[in-house]
From Swiss-Prot:
Gene3D superfamilies: Cytochrome Bc1 Complex, Chain C. The keyword Heme applies. GO terms for biological process: mitochondrial electron transport, ubiquinol to cytochrome c. This is Cytochrome b. The gene is mt-cyb. Keywords: Electron transport, Heme, Iron, Membrane, Metal-binding, Mitochondrion, Mitochondrion inner membrane, Respiratory chain, Transmembrane, Transmembrane helix, Transport, Ubiquinone.
Amino acid sequence: MASLRKTHPLLKIVNDALIDLPAPSNISAWWNFGSLLGLCLVTQILTGLFLAMHYTSDVATAFSSVAHICRDVNYGWLIRNIHANGASFFFICLYLHIGRGLYYGSYLYKETWNIGVVLFLLVMMTAFVGYVLPWGQMSFWGATVITNLLSAVPYVGDTLVQWIWGGFSVDNATLTRFFAFHFLFPFIIVALTVLHFFFLHETGSNNPTGINSDADKVPFHPYFSYKDLFGLVLLLLALSSLSFFSPNLLGDPDNFIPANPLVTPPHIKPEWYFLFAYAILRSIPNKLGGVLALLASILILMLVPILHTSKQRGLMFRPLTQLLFWILVADVMILTWIGGMPVEHPFIAVGQIASVLYFTLFLILIPTTGWLENKILEWN
């Protein structure tokens, strides 16, 4: 008689996705980040749920309700620290996951990749509205600056901004709706994650060589279930270490000052995981141009499958494109650094050069090098 997990309508789905799933035998630790992102998402939803039980989305009490959570609620400080730092780990895993996809050509699974880009945008939106909720100085001014960018939209810009604000400035209506969005978006992310998963399992996983691996598959359990478990332990170890020993390392000190519309902080900057996009936004001296560049910096990922020119899938056997990939990684790091710096010489020039290089790599250099490598292969 067949096992229950193979016959039960619900368990069969779990079995086909997590137990008897045929996986390439040679996928490396870079393939762990999908499950780590799942862990981050579950952690964020659970800690967020407990925070929402004590938080009040009102300008008069939001800041003090967060202080109350940290001081008076049982383990409230821990829940808040894990939620705040969990967001950073979410983005670390996200960037590594995207980097893996770019390096090994996983973007050629177009549906999976495009849903992934939409997920990336949604996670960014969720993190942005979440950062506004403690109603500190950086929360308020970050919300003001970023929502104000929508005023650059021709004709409807000003109306759009006031519609999002729910008034003539960032105020109580804005905070309340941002809390509603912050609660809603993670569940949309869960739904899209299921779709992401579904499309991935239509094709099966890619592998480091980029070669079809149908001839060499192993069951997901026990091989990759234990491998993923090891990744989960490392992630939880790193997250708990940061949350216990240095919970405010990645935060902004200005956010410990209650929001004051009359006093602007000396440097308005978002959390570290948005700095590369913020640097691209600031590198263009025109408002609409900056907004378009900001959008393009993320949406350019959707063009990657179209711009793939190489006959090989991944970069494992393509040293020239490998070099460009690592230049791209360094460029994103430089943009992240510039995004956190004041707008003055020499940071302006460095930011502009790095922004131009970012788009040039994606649109010109990497596709051209792929074509060149094809030619070199033909010569042999």
